[in-house]
């Protein structure tokens, strides 16, 4: 192959030097082998006799068993030597016969050029019968199949011969290393090695002879490599030319078959149209009607024959495609296995990718098969109706008795018989069509399956194979000469004779685009004025609307369209100019039009007093900065656009493209410098969403990663990823515009709701006769006051849309990452169907584990909250139930995520369960309290003795439950202090839940009255105070009890119930005040302890009363 010649020349010197070095080593090893063998190796008969003698012995010692094994291995080695010598002889014979085979192939190839004239061939074929032609078609198909098989065999052998130098190099090097080890062992120079047994020495000498035979065979194969390659190439050229001749011959045969079938069909049709009756009978209306039906059937028969011929040709074409695809699949696997990691492999892969059949070239046969079945069913129904000709004719003659006589009756019978024959032939043709359509569908399905598999293999391999040389020092030194050669190879050709008419037609086709662009430019002033009108309405409650921002963005989009339309029109003209790069320029113009549409729209939105400033409220300084950045980034992206188109349409041109490699590298470096400040600003913005930060960070890191790929030679991979990266940038820009538009729409809606509420309050004040102040015209509401549920649902839909579009951009490259499954990191033992197997943990498994961890983290962060907003908040659930559900859901996500991650890394559940059991036992003792609190937390969530919002008392702490976590529960006491209590306390200690099932609680107010008080009056006073209080429940009724005779009081208790816990303190306060007031009004003394002090002098007969001088500070004793 020509694509291998450069590669072979570049390796010639390396192989020559390596073969010379190995030859010197082999001469030394061969001389030593002959000197140390002390003659020839023992014969097989001698060895077999010794082995038989050992086998006859019943009891063998350990030494005898070793000798027995040595003899068996030596016999096997001698067999291999004989086989290799035989293969070497065959190789020599094959090399000797190669020139004669090449001469024969050359002569046969020359003979093929003297082909017969097509006209003479057609004349000869026209004399053959249809059966003879069909026999020749079958024979030609068999010959073509054999030729395709020979071509596949020759291609496979050529691949093996072209990649033989690498295999010979590795084999001879390994053999020389093994010979060196055997020589050292036979010499006894290895320190610490035991002495060789005689049988073991013979075995090693046999192994030495085997290696020498293998090396001799490899050397002979390398010597005959060029001759065999030339012979196979010539044979392949002959088979290729012969296949083309057979295909042409098959086409002529098929044309002859089609012509023969069509002639027979037309003859039948003519017989149907012109029966042997008189013109008078044919003029009969009934006969004429039936003859017209026969004529229609004859036309259907001709059409069916033509369709059958087309299906036959399509079958042949698809069958050839299928054979070539299967051959390519076999060859590509061998080439990948041998040439893995070389630049030659990338060239081969690019060529194979260009020859893949497209699905657009295949016809969908499902509907056609269904139509054929339906048509055949209708034909069979018509045939069944004609089974009894007389009955059918009699039925036709009903109602036409005046027009029918015996001659007309006979004519109708003849017409019906002819129709039956036509239907039989039509049914046969439809059956043949159906059979060929089904075969064609099967072949197409096989072809698409093989093509899909081949495309997947090519996509994976091309993506992970370096397409260019690395940008190292050698690349830099060779850059000037490589650049000079690249400029010399650039040629742009144009066929002016064919180009001018096509350019005129393309100009007419592009004229509507130019007219639309001119119309938009003409109405540009009106569009700007209308946009300013929309901008002036922003902020006004009477004129502002949620549609104002989409309208303004649509106007900016229309303003950006003229340049896009002009680019497309120019690209259309270049496409028709018959340039050798017309297709490339047309594809680039389409990408450039989309590029301008997105970045032009962004430029218009960010202009002074544009949508970003007037609608989104961005500062003008910030929009100016972003406009400058967009200009710089867009200019840096243009070369990447062009070379990404080259990578899609003509990847072979990238192989020696040092200019593109250097330009893309420095463009990516420039983009990295431009994008990184934007990423830094987003991280400094504290209001940025996490997903937005992650997206911008990834988009900023990608240029640096692409630079590394370009520098290491993965130029094609860089361009493929760069194209998707640019499309992702488009998505981010459009998504941000949509995001800001939605947020402004929600803000406008919130302001309108607030305005309506203000108007409603004003109307209520007017109705009540209290006219308030005029409400402000434009009440402002911060974005944080927008309904949070609506905002979160909107964000969920926005991110879902972003995910769908992101998948649509990158889905065609997802399959390339399956290549990571071929990179094994480590192994582990597993079971399948009860059998122990060794499984691999690949790079793909590690990537899946990372993605699963990220997905689990995202679900833990967002799913419980979204579930609360979307579902739980709309259900009538008990207090705290939604919190329990979301918490348990978090635990489930963590468990499933951990099992998925560990399972993908080779830690299956059957291993995890023992680990979990061991950890449970070990940690159960060391972390007993923590595990106890964790289990208690689960009990609390499931059994729900306490819930979020319950008022509880545990020990000396009382308050409201605010949080239930894995280890502890948080209680907010009545002093608004948060108390952290371990979960175990709620399960093991006594707990008072004041609001578990009912918030009704009892209050006890104790009162002591003085001795001598009217007890019945006291009872009435206490009951009156309780029954008249609005918060005291009447069922159960308040009760008063005289509980005890105190030291100085008559003790009473007022027992009553209140509905809510928050009413307890206020009710006690108000009842105490009421009771005090009623006791004063009813002369009931509330008793209290009194103490009298008497002072005696030393004699004991004088009492001194202490009186306080209220004018001074010191008491003045008074003696009385």
Swiss-Prot record:
<feature type="topological domain" description="Periplasmic">
    <location>
        <begin position="818"/>
        <end position="839"/>
    </location>
</feature>
<dbReference type="Pfam" id="PF12795">
    <property type="entry name" value="MscS_porin"/>
</dbReference>
<feature type="transmembrane region" description="Helical">
    <location>
        <begin position="922"/>
        <end position="942"/>
    </location>
</feature>
<feature type="transmembrane region" description="Helical">
    <location>
        <begin position="840"/>
        <end position="860"/>
    </location>
</feature>
<feature type="topological domain" description="Cytoplasmic">
    <location>
        <begin position="750"/>
        <end position="796"/>
    </location>
</feature>
<dbReference type="GO" id="GO:0008381">
    <property type="term" value="F:mechanosensitive monoatomic ion channel activity"/>
</dbReference>
<keyword id="KW-0472">Membrane</keyword>
<keyword id="KW-0812">Transmembrane</keyword>
<comment type="function">
    <text>Mechanosensitive channel that opens in response to membrane tension and specific ionic conditions. Requires high concentrations of external K(+), NH(4)(+), Rb(+) or Cs(+) to gate. May participate in the regulation of osmotic pressure changes within the cell, although it does not appear to have a major role in osmolarity regulation. Forms an ion channel of 1.0 nanosiemens conductance. The channel can remain active for between 30 seconds and over 3 minutes; it does not desensitize upon extended pressure. Its activity is masked in wild-type cells by the MscS channel.</text>
</comment>
<feature type="coiled-coil region">
    <location>
        <begin position="126"/>
        <end position="266"/>
    </location>
</feature>
<dbReference type="Pfam" id="PF21088">
    <property type="entry name" value="MS_channel_1st"/>
</dbReference>
<feature type="transmembrane region" description="Helical">
    <location>
        <begin position="693"/>
        <end position="713"/>
    </location>
</feature>
<keyword id="KW-1133">Transmembrane helix</keyword>
<feature type="transmembrane region" description="Helical">
    <location>
        <begin position="887"/>
        <end position="907"/>
    </location>
</feature>
<dbReference type="GO" id="GO:0009992">
    <property type="term" value="P:intracellular water homeostasis"/>
</dbReference>
<feature type="topological domain" description="Periplasmic">
    <location>
        <position position="582"/>
    </location>
</feature>
<feature type="transmembrane region" description="Helical">
    <location>
        <begin position="561"/>
        <end position="581"/>
    </location>
</feature>
<dbReference type="InterPro" id="IPR049278">
    <property type="entry name" value="MS_channel_C"/>
</dbReference>
<dbReference type="Pfam" id="PF00924">
    <property type="entry name" value="MS_channel_2nd"/>
</dbReference>
<feature type="topological domain" description="Periplasmic">
    <location>
        <begin position="908"/>
        <end position="921"/>
    </location>
</feature>
<feature type="topological domain" description="Cytoplasmic">
    <location>
        <begin position="943"/>
        <end position="1120"/>
    </location>
</feature>
<protein>
    <recommendedName>
        <fullName>Mechanosensitive channel MscK</fullName>
    </recommendedName>
</protein>
<feature type="transmembrane region" description="Helical">
    <location>
        <begin position="729"/>
        <end position="749"/>
    </location>
</feature>
<dbReference type="InterPro" id="IPR006686">
    <property type="entry name" value="MscS_channel_CS"/>
</dbReference>
<feature type="topological domain" description="Cytoplasmic">
    <location>
        <begin position="861"/>
        <end position="886"/>
    </location>
</feature>
<feature type="topological domain" description="Periplasmic">
    <location>
        <begin position="34"/>
        <end position="499"/>
    </location>
</feature>
<feature type="transmembrane region" description="Helical">
    <location>
        <begin position="797"/>
        <end position="817"/>
    </location>
</feature>
<feature type="signal peptide">
    <location>
        <begin position="1"/>
        <end position="33"/>
    </location>
</feature>
<dbReference type="GO" id="GO:0005886">
    <property type="term" value="C:plasma membrane"/>
</dbReference>
<dbReference type="GO" id="GO:0035864">
    <property type="term" value="P:response to potassium ion"/>
</dbReference>
<feature type="transmembrane region" description="Helical">
    <location>
        <begin position="635"/>
        <end position="655"/>
    </location>
</feature>
<dbReference type="GO" id="GO:0006813">
    <property type="term" value="P:potassium ion transport"/>
</dbReference>
<keyword id="KW-0633">Potassium transport</keyword>
<feature type="topological domain" description="Cytoplasmic">
    <location>
        <begin position="521"/>
        <end position="560"/>
    </location>
</feature>
<keyword id="KW-0175">Coiled coil</keyword>
<feature type="topological domain" description="Cytoplasmic">
    <location>
        <begin position="604"/>
        <end position="634"/>
    </location>
</feature>
<feature type="coiled-coil region">
    <location>
        <begin position="1057"/>
        <end position="1081"/>
    </location>
</feature>
<keyword id="KW-0406">Ion transport</keyword>
<keyword id="KW-0813">Transport</keyword>
<dbReference type="Pfam" id="PF21082">
    <property type="entry name" value="MS_channel_3rd"/>
</dbReference>
<keyword id="KW-0630">Potassium</keyword>
<dbReference type="InterPro" id="IPR052702">
    <property type="entry name" value="MscS-like_channel"/>
</dbReference>
């Amino acid at each position: 192959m020509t694509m291998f010649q450069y590669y072979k020349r570049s390796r010639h010197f390396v192989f020559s030097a390596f073969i010379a070095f190995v030859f010197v080593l082999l001469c030394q090893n061969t001389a030593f082998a002959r000197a140390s063998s002390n003659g020839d190796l023992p014969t097989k008969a001698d060895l077999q006799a010794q082995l038989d003698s050992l086998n006859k012995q019943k009891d063998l010692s350990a030494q005898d068993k070793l000798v027995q094994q040595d003899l068996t291995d030596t016999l096997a080695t001698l067999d291999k030597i004989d086989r290799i010598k035989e293969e070497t002889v065959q190789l020599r014979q094959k090399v000797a016969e190669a020139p004669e085979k090449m001469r024969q192939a050359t002569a046969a190839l020359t003979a093929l050029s003297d082909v017969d004239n097509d006209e003479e061939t057609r004349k000869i074929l026209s004399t053959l019968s249809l059966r003879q032609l069909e026999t020749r078609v079958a024979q030609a198909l068999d010959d073509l199949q054999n030729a395709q098989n020979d071509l596949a065999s020759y291609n496979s052998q050529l691949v093996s011969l072209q990649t033989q130098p690498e295999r010979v190099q590795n084999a001879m090097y390994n053999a020389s290393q093994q010979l060196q080890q055997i020589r050292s062992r036979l010499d006894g120079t290895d320190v610490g090695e035991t002495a060789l047994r005689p049988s073991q020495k013979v075995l090693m000498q046999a192994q030495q002879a085997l290696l020498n035979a293998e090396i001799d065979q490899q050397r002979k194969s390398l010597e005959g490599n060029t001759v065999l390659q030339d012979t196979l190439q010539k044979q392949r050229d002959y088979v290729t030319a012969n296949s083309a001749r057979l295909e042409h011959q098959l086409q002529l045969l098929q044309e002859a078959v089609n012509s023969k079938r069509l002639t027979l069909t037309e003859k039948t049709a003519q017989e149907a149209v012109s029966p042997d009756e008189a013109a008078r009978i044919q003029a009969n209306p009934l006969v004429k009607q039936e003859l017209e039906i026969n004529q229609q059937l004859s036309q259907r028969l001709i059409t069916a024959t033509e369709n059958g011929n087309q299906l036959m040709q399509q079958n042949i074409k698809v069958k050839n495609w299928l054979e070539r695809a299967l051959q390519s699949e076999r060859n590509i696997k061998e080439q990948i296995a041998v040439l893995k990691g070389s630049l030659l492999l990338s060239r081969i892969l690019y060529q194979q990718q260009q020859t893949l059949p497209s699905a657009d070239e295949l016809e969908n046969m499902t509907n056609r098969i269904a139509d054929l079945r339906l048509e055949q069913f209708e034909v069979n129904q018509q045939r069944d109706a004609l089974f009894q000709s007389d009955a059918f004719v009699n039925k036709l003659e009903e109602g036409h008795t005046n027009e029918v006589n015996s001659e007309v009756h006979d004519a109708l019978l003849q017409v019906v018989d002819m129709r039956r024959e036509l239907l039989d032939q039509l049914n046969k043709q439809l059956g043949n069509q159906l059979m060929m359509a089904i075969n064609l569908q099967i072949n197409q399905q096989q072809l698409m399956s093989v093509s899909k598999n081949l495309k997947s293999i090519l996509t994976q391999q091309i993506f992970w194979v370096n397409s260019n040389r690395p940008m190292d020092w050698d690349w830099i030194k060779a850059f000037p000469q490589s650049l000079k050669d690249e400029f010399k190879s650039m040629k742009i050709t144009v066929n002016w004779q064919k180009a001018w008419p096509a350019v005129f037609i393309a100009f007419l086709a592009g004229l509507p685009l130019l007219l639309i662009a001119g119309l938009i430019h003409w109405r540009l002033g009106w569009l700007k004025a209308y946009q300013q009108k929309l901008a002036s309405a922003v902020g006004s409650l009477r004129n502002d609307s949620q549609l104002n921002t989409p309208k303004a963005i649509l106007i900016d989009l229309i303003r950006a369209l003229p340049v896009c339309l002009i680019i497309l029109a120019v690209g259309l003209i270049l496409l028709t100019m018959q340039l050798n790069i017309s297709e490339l320029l047309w594809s680039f113009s389409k990408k450039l039009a989309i590029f301008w549409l997105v970045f032009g729209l962004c430029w218009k939105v960010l202009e002074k007093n544009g949508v970003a400033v007037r609608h989104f409220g961005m500062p003008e300084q910030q929009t100016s900065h972003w406009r400058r950045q967009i200009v710089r980034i867009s200019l840096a992206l243009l070369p990447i656009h062009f070379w990404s188109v080259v990578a899609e349409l003509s990847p072979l041109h990238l192989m020696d493209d040092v200019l593109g490699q250097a330009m893309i590298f420095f463009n990516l470096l420039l983009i990295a410098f431009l994008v990184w400040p934007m990423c830094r600003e987003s991280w400094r913005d504290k209001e940025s969403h996490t997903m937005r930060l992650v997206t911008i960070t990834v988009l900023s890191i990608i240029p640096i990663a692409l630079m590394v790929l370009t520098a290491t030679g993965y130029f094609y991979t860089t361009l493929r990823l760069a194209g998707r990266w640019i499309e992702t940038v488009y998505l981010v820009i459009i998504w941000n515009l949509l995001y800001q538009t939605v947020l402004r729409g929600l803000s406008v809606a919130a302001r309108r709701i607030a305005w309506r509420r203000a108007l409603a309050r004003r109307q209520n004040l007017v109705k009540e006769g209290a006219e308030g102040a005029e409400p402000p015209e434009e009440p402002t509401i911060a974005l944080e006051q927008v309904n949070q549920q609506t905002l979160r649902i909107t964000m969920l839909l926005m991110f879902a849309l972003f995910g769908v579009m992101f998948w649509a951009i990158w889905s065609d490259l997802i399959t390339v990452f399956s290549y990571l499954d071929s990179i094994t990191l480590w192994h582990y033992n597993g079971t399948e169907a009860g059998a122990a197997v060794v499984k691999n943990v690949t790079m793909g498994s590690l990537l899946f584990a990372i993605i699963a961890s990220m997905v689990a983290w995202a679900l833990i962060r967002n799913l419980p909250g979204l579930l609360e907003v979307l579902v739980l908040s709309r259900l009538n659930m008990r207090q705290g139930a939604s919190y329990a559900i979301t918490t348990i859901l978090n635990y489930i996500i963590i468990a499933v995520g951990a099992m998925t991650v560990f399972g993908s890394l080779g830690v299956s559940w059957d291993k995890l369960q023992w680990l979990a059991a061991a950890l449970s036992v070990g940690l159960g003792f060391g972390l007993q309290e923590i595990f106890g609190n964790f289990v208690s937390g689960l009990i609390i969530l499931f059994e729900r003795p306490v819930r979020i919002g319950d008022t509880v008392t545990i020990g000396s702490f009382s308050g409201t439950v605010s949080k239930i976590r894995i280890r502890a529960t948080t209680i907010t006491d009545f002093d608004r202090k948060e108390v952290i209590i371990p979960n175990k306390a709620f399960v093991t200690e006594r707990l008072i839940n004041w609001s578990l099932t009912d918030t009704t609680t009892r209050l006890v107010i104790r009162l002591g009255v003085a001795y001598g008080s009217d007890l019945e009056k006291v009872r009435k006073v206490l009951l009156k105070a309780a029954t008249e209080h609005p918060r005291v429940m009447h069922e159960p009724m308040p009760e008063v009890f005289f509980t005890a005779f105190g030291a100085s009081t008559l003790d009473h208790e007022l027992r009553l119930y209140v509905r809510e816990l928050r009413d307890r303190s206020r009710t006690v306060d108000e009842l105490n005040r009421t009771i005090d007031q009623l006791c004063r009004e009813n002369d009931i003394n509330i008793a209290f302890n009194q103490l009298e002090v008497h002072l005696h002098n030393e004699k004991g007969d004088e009492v001194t009363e202490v009186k306080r001088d209220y004018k001074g500070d010191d008491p003045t004793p008074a003696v009385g």
